Each structure stands twice: as structure tokens, then as C-alpha cells.
Design a protein with these regions (language model features):
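Short, charged/polar micro-motifs that form catalytic or ligand-binding hotspots
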Residues: 22, 27, 96, 159, ...
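Short linear interaction motifs
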Residues: 17-18, 87, 324-327
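Single conserved hydrophobic/aromatic residue that forms the stacking wall/gate
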Residues: 1-11
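Internal, well-ordered alpha/beta segment that forms a basic, Gly-enriched binding/recognition surface
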Residues: 89, 97-192
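Hydrophobic, aromatic-lined core segments that form the binding pocket/scaffold
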Residues: 183-410
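Ferredoxin-type iron-sulfur electron-transfer modules and their immediate structural context
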Residues: 12-35, 59
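Membrane helical hairpin/interfacial module
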Residues: 40-88
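Local cysteine-cluster metal-coordination motifs and their immediate loop/turn environment
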Residues: 24-42, 77-112, 125-132
Length: 410
């Protein structure tokens, strides 16, 4: 396959890209409503482990007994809190040994890095409440800044032509997502259609004609085609299935499972829907009514909610889409972004119902960062999500539109 190349070592100057809000972040430490030092396994890098073995002084014993040296991880207590995390949610290692003592994971988080040939893309993860607060509070479309480093580094070689086309595609998709003259669902539909047809060409090994896909979806006929697809009433079954897929994932926080069960009951009624077909129909009708009222409420009391969803879509696509250069899976990464925002919307609807039909900005931040932690802090969960996206295509990419065929040729 053309996108799986022999990996070679090369040296070249690097370009760095960051979102324009990157430098707005500053850790608020003990003032944070949550902690990044619990609920997931912190793996220390080799350099940090070597440094820890050489530590002397009063903190040495604590350090030695708090690390699983065989696995290279920090131990956790019964509540999955890091062994170095104190009751004030501050790091005792940082206090005793200073910032330079931190391992790479702890120094970097919530910064996330994706490596592409001579480009290093740096983002901030919305699994951090403070990052979620910054992004969701941002009204202007996100811009991406690029600068060059004189420092030469080694990287693994890959298919530069496919990567360049993926970068072009990502820019086109982000431009569409940020075109606020169009309704958000239309923007999302256009982006999904582009990603679908892009995937078909990657599968055909027809990378040279990818630019034709971009041109096709600039036409009014393409817009009308996508609008017609969006009007099909199959969203309920799809989103319900996507919601239940979350139970297949590993749990990083013990409270996430009960949270999902409560939300599902509020959204869809009886969880097993073991009642009659008539009762299940009533659940669907109630869901539709609740969703309509929720959208009316959002338009009145949270009119910027579509901007927040736009920012999240741009976040997920900017972070993960170009990773398709390594596995050729462009479409599933876009559907994962869309499904993630759909699930966040469902969780917010459930929270709105639980709050007796009201919602605060803190509810939005809480939902976003908790969802992100469960998905993005687990490689198995990210891999499973992509697998599920391959299995469960949006309905209008099936039936008459076989997944190996392009959308209606405009």
C-alpha cells in the first residue's frame, strides 16, 4: 500500500504548528476542579527513570517506593491517584525536587504532539478542564500558527505526497467548518462527504486526483446533495448506537460508567427497551421532543453553542486527521470527530434534563473534558473508536452509496 513506506532515518529542519490559543494556557494547579494525576497510568520516560535512580536526600525513599520500576510507571492508590499526588492535588515530587524532576508526560500535559516528517504539530488537549474552558470560551475561528526551528532532528520517513494532500484536505475541511454563513449541520455534512470521497481515492491509490474532490464540494449542486442527505430521519438510531458503543471502551474513571447509564436513561428511556414496540416508539417521540426543546433553549440562553461545537470539531480534526498518513484511514478520523461532538451534545442534553432544563457553562466544560479523558487518554479506546467508525458508517454512506464508491458525482 502506498502510504505504508519503509521507515528511514532522515535529518531536516522542523516546522512547528500551534493553535492561536496555545500560549493562553497556564496550569492552575491546586485550583483546578479536577486533577491530571489520577485515573490514568503515567508512564515515565527512560531519561527520567535514570534520573530518579540517582536521587539522594530525604525524598529518595518516597521516590523509590512510589515507582513501579519494572513497568516504568508511577504507582497509584486505590482511587487511581498518582502516588506523588497529595490531598491538595499538588505534586510532592515537584515540591521536593522542582520542575526539572518531572517526567516527559507530566511536563508535556496537556500539550499533545503529532510528528509528521519535518513538521511537529502541537495542540492542547481538551481533557484538561482549563484548556476546555479556553477553547469553549473562544468566539473567533481558531487559526494555526507556523514557525521554523533551526534545530535539526531525526524523524521517520513516510509518504510525503499523501501527507501534503492530507494537509490540503484538512485545511479545506477546517475552512468549511469555520464558514459561519452555512448552518453547522451542512458544514459537517460537507466535511464528511469530502472525507468519504478522499478515502475512496486513497483506497484506489488515486492520490493525484484528490484535488478534484475539493473542487466537487465547492459547487451549489454538492451543497444541495448534502442537504438532502441531512434531511433523512435516521439520526436517532445511529446516535443511540454510537452512545452505547461507549460501554465497549475501557473505563479510566470509576464514575464514568454510572454517568453514562444515567444519561442513557434520561435520553432514551428504558435502557434495554424491553417494553413493547409502542413503548419504544414513545421513548423516541419523547427524545425528539426533548431535543427540539433543548435546541430552542440553547438558541435562547446559549446562542454560541454552535461556535463551541465548531471549535471542538476543528480540535479533533486538526489533532488526528493527518495521522492517516500512517494508516490510510482518513474517513474514520473525520467520523470520529463528528461522532465525538454528537456524543458530547447527547451528554449535554442529558445534563440539561437532569438539571430540570437548564445548563451552565461549567456543565459544558465538565462534559467536554470528561469525555475527552475517557477517549484520548487511552490508546485502546482511540483504536476501538476508529474500528467502530469503520464498522458503523453514517447511513448515507451505505445502501445505494457503497462505501467503496464516491458520493453522487456532481
Amino acid at each position: 500500500e502506498p502510504y505504508r513506506r519503509q521507515r528511514q532515518m532522515c535529518i531536516r529542519d522542523r516546522l512547528y504548528t500551534i493553535p492561536d490559543y496555545y500560549h493562553e494556557f497556564s496550569c492552575i494547579a491546586g485550583k483546578c476542579e479536577d486533577t491530571c494525576c489520577a485515573g490514568w497510568q503515567i508512564v515515565a520516560d527512560e531519561a527520567a527513570l535514570k534520573k530518579y535512580k540517582k536521587v539522594t536526600g530525604s525524598f529518595r525513599k518516597r521516590l523509590r517506593r512510589s515507582i513501579n520500576w519494572k513497568e516504568g510507571t508511577f504507582k497509584q492508590d486505590k482511587n487511581k491517584r498518582c502516588a506523588f499526588l497529595n490531598d491538595e492535588n499538588l505534586c510532592d515530587m515537584y515540591t521536593a525536587l522542582g520542575e526539572k524532576s518531572l517526567c516527559r508526560t507530566c511536563k508535556m500535559y496537556p500539550r499533545h504532539v503529532e510528528e509528521f516528517e519535518d513538521v511537529r504539530e502541537m495542540t492542547l488537549s481538551v481533557s484538561c478542564p482549563e484548556v476546555a474552558r479556553i477553547l469553549l470560551g473562544k468566539k473567533e475561528p481558531v487559526r494555526f500558527l507556523t514557525y521554523e526551528s533551526n534545530k535539526e532532528e531525526e524523524y521517520d520517513d513516510f509518504d510525503p505526497f499523501l501527507y501534503s494532500k492530507l494537509v490540503d484536505a484538512r485545511k479545506v475541511m477546517i475552512d468549511i467548518l469555520q464558514d459561519r454563513d452555512k448552518k453547522l449541520d451542512l458544514r459537517v455534512g460537507l466535511v464528511l462527504a469530502i472525507a468519504h470521497d478522499l478515502q475512496v481515492r486513497i483506497k484506489r491509490e488515486d492520490i493525484f486526483s484528490i484535488d478534484d474532490v475539493f473542487e466537487k464540494y465547492q459547487t451549489e449542486k454538492a451543497v444541495q446533495f448534502v442537504e438532502a442527505k441531512l434531511s433523512e430521519d435516521e439520526n436517532y438510531a445511529f446516535i443511540k448506537k454510537m452512545f452505547r458503543n461507549q460501554y465497549l471502551m475501557e473505563r479510566l474513571r470509576d464514575d464514568w460508567g454510572p454517568h453514562l447509564l444515567e444519561a442513557e436513561s434520561l435520553l432514551y428511556g428504558d435502557i434495554g427497551c424491553s417494553d413493547s414496540e409502542e413503548q419504544c416508539t414513545k421513548y423516541k417521540e419523547q427524545y425528539t421532543k426533548n431535543k427540539r426543546e433543548f435546541h430552542e433553549w440553547l438558541n435562547t440562553y446559549m446562542p454560541d453553542y454552535e461556535i463551541q461545537y465548531e471549535q471542538l470539531l476543528v480540535y479533533f480534526i486538526s489533532t488526528y486527521f493527518c495521522g492517516a498518513v500512517y494508516d490510510g484511514e482518513a474517513y474514520v478520523k473525520v467520523q470520529m470527530a463528528v461522532v465525538s461532538v454528537l456524543l458530547i451534545h447527547e451528554l449535554l442534553l442529558a445534563q440539561w434534563l437532569k438539571n430540570e432544563k437548564t445548563l451552565e457553562m461549567e456543565d459544558v466544560i465538565d462534559t467536554v473534558y470528561r469525555y475527552s479523558r475517557e477517549l484520548e487518554h487511552s490508546d485502546p479506546n482511540l483504536n476501538l473508536m476508529e474500528k467502530l467508525m469503520r464498522r458503523d458508517l453514517l447511513s448515507w454512506f451505505k445502501k445505494e452509496n457503497d462505501s467503496d464508491k464516491e458520493m453522487d458525482r456532481h
